[in-house]
């Protein structure tokens, strides 16, 4: 059974053709909420969605699979919610607003993720992902909220607009990492007036 550990966004391991065939003797299950990607000699071979695979279905899916070492990357495929710590932002009328935000993300392009984010590491934890996200989201919220008044920020319509602008900006920033932001939601905006 292949699945991503609870605290990991993606893990990588190396195996051989013989080991994979041994796992497939009966069948190999890619767990729900997981995708398996296979790379051989730096070449992307294909991916496996959740489901059960046999030697025949495995080989049919990977037309160019050869003997030798194969790298398997197990990644979360479900939409993953991440709640970020509160961020203090100054509005255009000089009020400090504490903003809590939550975003939902999903793996979009494994090749970009491997090249630009995972790199030589064998794992990329959810904590690593949160650490990468926090400064980008903070900067985007500073920009989008900092150009608004306190009354604007507390308005539901403007809060939705801020979330939309933040999502577009974050997607642009993280597109090169192969990660898609499904939603960026402002949970609360509190200030001491």
Residue ranges of each PLM-predicted region?
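Amphipathic, interface-forming alpha-helical segments with heptad-repeat character
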Residues: 29-32, 36, 41-190
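N-terminal, positively charged regions that mediate nucleic acid binding
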Residues: 1-47
């Amino acid at each position: 059974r292949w699945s991503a550990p609870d605290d990991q966004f993606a893990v990588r391991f190396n195996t051989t053709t013989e080991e994979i065939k041994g796992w497939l003797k009966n069948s190999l299950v890619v767990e729900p909420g997981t995708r398996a990607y296979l790379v051989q000699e730096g070449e992307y071979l294909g991916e496996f969605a959740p489901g059960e695979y046999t030697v025949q279905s495995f080989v049919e899916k990977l037309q160019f699979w050869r003997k030798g070492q194969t790298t398997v990357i197990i990644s979360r495929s479900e939409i993953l919610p991440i709640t970020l710590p509160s961020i203090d932002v100054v509005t255009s009328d000089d009020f400090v607003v504490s903003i809590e935000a939550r975003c939902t993300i999903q793996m979009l392009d494994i090749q970009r993720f491997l090249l630009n984010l995972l790199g030589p590491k064998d794992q990329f934890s959810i904590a690593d992902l949160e650490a990468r996200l926090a400064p980008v989201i903070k900067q985007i919220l500073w920009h989008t909220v900092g150009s608004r008044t306190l009354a604007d920020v507390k308005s539901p319509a403007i809060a939705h607009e801020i979330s939309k602008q933040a999502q577009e900006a974050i997607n642009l920033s993280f597109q090169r990492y192969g990660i898609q932001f499904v939603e960026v939601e402002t949970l609360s905006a509190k200030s001491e007036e």
